[in-house]
Regions:
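C-terminal output helix
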Residues: 82-91
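Helix N-cap/capping motif at the beta->alpha junctions
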Residues: 8-17, 38
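Receiver (REC) domain active-site loop signature in two-component systems and cognate sites
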Residues: 33
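Conserved phosphotransfer cores of two-component systems
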Residues: 20-22, 44-52, 72
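Active-site beta3 strand of CheY-like receiver
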Residues: 22-28
Length: 97
């Protein structure tokens, strides 16, 4: 069983602040958040030089939503609800754990 250190952000602006302060290895970015949505937060993290994997999380599983996530700079996409085995598989995809 793997253990991970998790930082939470309640909105897109806070996600950017956490990225700058904590320098995580991966971001699971909810698309619908108050203050600033996850797509805009992803764009700004990429503009700041963030190259880490950013995985879009959304309740909308439409192709157009997936395309918007990739255009914003997300590396991958998961539709909610997120199941633990699928999340582990996603982490392993990027870190080979």
């Amino acid at each position: 069983r793997k253990e991970y250190e998790v930082y939470r952000a309640h909105d897109g602006q806070e996600a950017i602040e956490k990225f700058e302060g904590c320098r995580p290895d991966m971001i699971l970015m909810d698309i619908k958040m108050p203050v600033m949505d996850g797509l805009e937060a992803t764009r700004r993290i990429r503009l700041k030089g963030g190259t880490l994997p950013i995985i879009a999380l959304t309740a909308n599983a439409y192709d157009s939503d997936r395309d918007k996530a990739f255009e914003a700079g997300c590396d991958d996409y998961m539709a909610k609800p997120i199941m633990a085995p699928a999340l582990r598989e996603m982490i392993e995809k990027y870190f080979g754990e």
